[in-house]
Structures are given as structure tokens and as C-alpha cells.
């Protein structure tokens, strides 16, 4: 399935979603941002994309601490779906728990801690966009 120039951002914090979306659009206005407030919304969106045979996102950015379905469980469900295996996932979280990092390192997933400064944020957005560009097809 073809990938798009679209990033799926999954975070229950509306302010973080807005900030991340704006930062991505500032650097890459051609990148479409799709937002989901939890893992269930994200999985529903991905199932709809597959059902419609639409292009998959070039990247999924997941928060870890979310209601209904947390980031780890969402990630596990995404990676259990053969059609989604090739879509890279990056974790963008306020968690500083070493076990969270260890879990995702097993899967070669980049984990970004939500930054305290604009400079750190810009660096993270650049890394996220490079992940997306390497996958867009």
C-alpha cells in the first residue's frame, strides 16, 4: 500500500497536538497532519484508511500516557497488523520512565521526550520529518 505525505499524531493532550502540528507545518507546510486523541481513534483511522485503500501515513507519532488505549498497546496493535508493519512509529512523550524507552528500543522505535524549549522542539520536528520523508512514496 502506498504511503502519503501525512503524519498521524496521537496524543490526548490537545495543546501538545496543536503545538506539534503547528511546528510540523511551519517546517513542512505540504505535510498533512491527522490528529487522534487516543489509541482507539488512531486505530479506527488506520482501519478506515486501509478499508478505503487510501495511502497510509508516512509516520505515526504516539504519546504513551493516554486514556482508553495507551501508547504501548496502540503500538503493539499497529505492529501486529501486516499492512501497517512498514509504517514507522515515533514515540513523543513526557514519560521519563526507563522501561518505556527500553520497550521501544527493542523495536528500533525512536523515543522523543517532550521538550522544554523551542530549540529542542525544532530538533525533534526535524527528526520526525526526516523519518516521514524516508518513508513517503
Give, region by region, the residue ranges found by the protein language model.
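His-Asp phosphorelay/catalytic-motif detector in bacterial-type signaling
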Residues: 3, 30, 55-58, 83-88
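Two-component/phosphorelay signaling modules centered on CheY-like receiver
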Residues: 14-38
Amino acid at each position: 500500500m502506498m504511503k502519503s505525505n501525512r503524519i498521524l499524531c496521537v496524543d490526548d493532550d490537545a495543546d501538545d497536538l496543536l503545538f506539534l502540528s503547528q511546528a510540523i507545518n511551519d517546517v513542512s507546510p505540504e505535510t498533512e497532519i491527522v490528529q487522534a486523541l487516543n489509541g482507539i481513534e488512531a486505530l479506527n483511522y488506520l482501519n478506515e484508511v486501509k478499508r478505503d485503500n487510501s495511502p497510509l501515513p508516512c509516520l505515526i507519532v504516539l504519546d504513551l500516557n493516554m486514556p482508553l488505549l495507551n501508547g504501548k498497546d496502540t503500538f503493539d496493535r499497529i505492529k501486529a497488523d501486516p499492512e501497517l508493519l512498514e509504517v514507522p512509529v515515533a514515540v513523543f512523550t513526557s514519560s521519563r520512565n526507563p522501561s518505556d524507552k527500553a520497550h521501544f528500543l527493542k523495536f528500533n522505535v525512536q523515543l522523543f521526550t517532550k521538550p522544554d524549549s523551542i530549540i529542542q522542539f525544532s530538533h525533534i520536528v526535524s527528526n520526525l520529518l526526516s523519518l516521514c520523508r524516508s518513508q513517503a512514496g
